[in-house]
Regions:
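Short acidic, S/G/P-rich loop/turn micro-motifs used as interaction or catalytic elements
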Residues: 17-19, 265-270, 358-361, 387-388, ...
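Conserved TIR/SEFIR loop-to-helix hotspot centered on a Trp-containing motif
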Residues: 413-434
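Conserved N-terminal substructure of TIR/SEFIR domains
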Residues: 343-410, 429-438, 444-447, 476-507
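Short beta-alpha junction loops
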Residues: 296-301, 413-414, 442-450
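Conserved beta-strand scaffold positions in the cores of enzyme catalytic domains, especially
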Residues: 9-12, 381, 439-441, 460, ...
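Glycine-rich, charge-decorated loop segments at or immediately adjacent to ligand/cofactor-binding or catalytic sites
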Residues: 447-462
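Extended, non-catalytic interaction/assembly segments in eukaryotic proteins
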Residues: 1-345
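C-terminal helix of von Willebrand factor
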Residues: 16-33, 470-493
């Protein structure tokens, strides 16, 4: 299942049995002869390009240099150049990790590695340099370290992108300025992990067909704001949520292909912290073809896994208890509602960001401040840059606006000069008055917003609609805006119904 169609068959072999080895060789030859790529005929000029690349002394060349080399050797067609690049990559002559589906980050496409050991040496230099920092460092620190090995800043950034592509490292922030290398985390869990007593905790977990190596490091990176360096290790992390006073032990077991979560602290805060944990795992799970099975572990029998889907099915059939067999063969009945009620969550609020494209750099500042709320599963911001290529943008915007729980408008002179923005604002006011959505607006520049019909009835952010230009410190302005939004989100969520438990949260 892991390798899909790449597995062509299985051949039983025994080193003492020459016939089985002969059979294996025959099978390999048969599969090689069936490969269409081996039958391809290459133009003579492609061999000249291959030889030229092999003779170069540089560690890597740029995309443009590669194209120039192709043209000098008679290959001027861009499509043929790209096709040849794919073959050169497969042959290990000029590696390009951004071609086709080899990498999502197209920045990798602009470098051809001619000496693989150059990449390997750079990676090992970073591993050695940041052992004492337990694998957490900044890009600037990486640039400084690799400069000692004659790597340019551009070379360092390329190697970091390559490490991220192969999940050797993970970003700790949106701008990828802070980096985590899981391989440098401690092998052993900290002593604090022993303080979690499953019999006294809210216990939850996931069962996987196979536990991928990158899953837990991605989770650690996504929830780094709730963890500390000394409470992270290769197979787990301890999180602490200051807003609820609760802590969580999240630990992976590769042999059992499962992740277990134990949450202690005030009862009323456990559900909220579990919601944050589940939200971040669901974001990660959305990248996988398989879906893990959500499980709960009764405090009275913390080693006994009960599938959430099965408990929900029992609850729908009006069953009130489920029988659990203990290790000593004793059978106890557990209340189903007690097991699944703590899993109920409030879905993240869908935010629609309404702004003028001329003020896009300012809306990006807001998105940075919303990121923490998004990672905590409180909000899901949407703006028109989310529209995918080929999608009709006007119907998509209208659909998202009508589906939003809260519309956030960035008011400015540019905003009121746009017919599209005005239409969005009118629709937002109508939905607010109809009780269909919340409206939050903040004033970016002096724009005469009080003259807009119906808008003067609302309290605008920040304090009394004071524009950015009237603040001595822009950071204080954005802090006032985000605190106002947080207050509105908290009020909206408090009035919202809790959603019943489900194995996977909706994204």
């Amino acid at each position: 299942e892991k390798y899909g169609g790449n597995i062509k068959g299985f051949v039983a072999t025994d080193c003492d049995d020459k016939k089985s080895i002969t059979q294996l060789k025959r099978k390999i030859v048969e599969e090689l002869q069936a490969m269409e790529s081996l039958k391809a005929r290459f133009p003579r000029r492609w061999f000249a390009i291959k030889d030229a690349l092999s003779q170069m002394k540089a560690e890597h060349i740029s995309f443009e240099d590669y194209r120039t080399l192709c043209q000098k050797n008679g290959e001027s067609d861009p499509a043929s150049q790209t096709s040849l690049a794919g073959f050169l990559h497969d042959l290990g002559i000029a590696l390009n990790y951004g071609l086709g589906n080899r990498g999502q980050d197209q920045r990798l496409r602009f470098n051809y590695v001619l000496k693989p050991e150059w990449v390997t040496q750079g990676i090992y230099a970073l591993l050695h340099a940041f052992v004492r920092k337990k694998g957490v460092f900044t890009r600037a620190e990486a640039v400084s370290e690799l400069a000692k090995k004659d790597y340019s800043p551009e070379d360092t950034h390329f190697i970091l992108e390559l490490m991220e592509l192969f999940e050797l490292s993970f970003p700790l922030d949106d701008r990828h300025n802070r980096v985590l290398i899981p391989e440098l985390l401690a092998d052993q869990q900290p002593k604090d992990a022993a303080s979690f007593k499953p019999a006294e905790c809210l216990n939850f977990g996931y069962k996987y067909p196979v536990l991928t190596e990158g899953l837990l490091p991605r989770f650690i990176a996504r929830t780094h704001h709730l963890g500390r360096a000394e409470t992270r290790w290769k197979s787990g992390v301890i999180l602490k949520d200051p807003s609820t006073g609760c802590s969580a032990l999240v630990r992976a077991d590769a042999a059992e292909a499962e992740v277990r979560v134990h949450i202690d602290g005030p009862q009323e805060g456990r559900r909220e912290l579990l919601g944050i944990i589940r939200f971040n795992f669901d974001v990660i799970h959305s990248d996988y073809e398989f879906k893990p099975e959500a499980q709960v572990y009764p405090p009275a029998a913390p080693q006994k896994a009960l599938a959430v889907d099965e408990l929900e099915a029992l609850a729908r059939s009006k069953a009130t208890t489920v029988s659990v067999v203990l290790p000593d063969k004793t059978v106890i009945d557990q209340d189903i509602a007690t097991l699944i009620d703590p899993l109920a969550t409030r879905p993240p609020l869908k935010l629609f960001l309404s702004y003028s494209h001329q003020d896009e750099n300012f809306i990006n500042e807001l998105r940075k401040d919303l990121k923490l709320m998004q990672m905590n599963g409180l909000v899901y911001p949407w703006h028109d840059r989310n529209i995918t290529a080929g999608e009709q943008w006007e119907p998509s915007i209208l659909e998202e606006l009508n589906a939003a729980d809260m519309v956030i408008c960035q008011l400015s002179r540019n905003y009121f000069a746009s017919d599209y923005c005005i239409a969005e604002l009118k629709a937002a006011i109508q939905r607010k008055l109809a009780g269909e959505a919340e409206l939050v607006a903040y004033v970016l520049t002096d724009c005469g917003w009080k003259e807009f019909p119906g808008l003067s009835k609302f309290q605008l952010l920040p304090t009394d609609g004071k524009p950015l230009s009237d603040w001595n410190d822009s950071n204080k302005y954005w802090r006032a805006v985000i605190e106002g939004i947080q207050k509105a989100v908290k009020k909206f969520q408090a009035e919202r119904k809790i959603r019943p438990a489900r194995g996977t949260l909706d994204m």
